[in-house]
């Protein structure tokens, strides 16, 4: 069993702060080709996660926020924003399925 606790969050956040991209993954899956990727992604202010999608094979994503807040945008095929929201667990917005 792998427990998500304050120590894991703090350690992953410390690594994110040292990363040039200001983010760091903690992978729960063993291999990148596992059918489901399970990870904790510590993202610090100033980082940018480019719009992307997983097509081969098609995969949905779920974002669950444990700390902080983040803006999430959905785009159409032409790159226009179709949906947007702010996730912030302190305000009751904990996650989004994309």
Each model region followed by its residue ranges:
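A short, N-terminal "cap"/entry segment at the start of jelly-roll beta-barrel domains
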Residues: 1-37, 83-89
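Intrinsic-disorder/low-complexity, polar/charged segments enriched in Ser/Thr/Lys/Arg/Asp/Glu/Gln
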Residues: 38, 48, 93-97
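Conserved short histidine dyad/triad with adjacent acidic residue
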Residues: 40-59
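Glycine- and acidic-residue-biased ligand/ion/polar-headgroup-sensing regions
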Residues: 58-78
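Short acidic-glycine-tyrosine-enriched beta hairpin
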Residues: 62, 76-98
